[in-house]
Amino acid sequence: MILENFKRESLIPLPVTFISTTSKDGIRNIAPYSCVMPVLRPFDLICVASAKMRDTVVNIKDTGEFVINMPGVEMVDKVIPTASHVPFDVNEFELADLKERPSKKVKAPGIEGCYAWMECKLHNIYEDEYEGFPYLLILGKVVHLEVNDDIYNPEDGSWDIEKANPLMMVESDRGMHFCTVSDINKFEPYGAMFPDGKDPLAWMYEKRETRE
């Protein structure tokens, strides 16, 4: 079946994240974002694609900070309230009945009830326009990363996907279909991709762990 080119997003399962920011006047904002991806490995950069006219974008430009919050499926009912178009001076934590979680390295608070939090400083913004529609790619540098203890194994860096139950989404002509992921019990080391069986980036992980 041949599809229209723009429907490529319908075939890619996307994470659902909540990005929390604070305006320069201290107003709290939350918005759901799915076009979010880490930039390679083991960098500490993360990329967010956004329409230009968003309160989140204004706050990130003004303050240079934001938090990417990772919710489980139990928070699916918070997506629409935080996506609603409301006046700039509305506190969306109160609107969505969400509790603030104090951040360690940025002023913007995280969101209680999520399973992971990425506190970010603005690294760069790339602005462009496509067919008359302005958009941005926001690059953030993760300055503090935290995850619930009960889902993460510090011994090998793995995490319990089924316990975290990450909220995800696929799109269709009618709207958003929310879903999650499951473990298929298959594992391969990074080195399996290379002829000598060694991960050429292993030294970078060791260097970072030593530095931290």
From Swiss-Prot:
Record has Flavoprotein as a keyword: yes
One protein family per Pfam: Flavin_Reduct
Domain of life: Archaea
Keywords associated with the record: Flavoprotein, FMN
SUPFAM superfamilies on file: FMN-binding split barrel
Cofactor(s) required for function per UniProt: FMN
Gene Ontology MF annotations: FMN binding
Entry similarity comment: Belongs to the flavoredoxin family.
Name of the protein in its database record: Uncharacterized protein MTH_574
Organism: Methanothermobacter thermautotrophicus (strain ATCC 29096 / DSM 1053 / JCM 10044 / NBRC 100330 / Delta H)
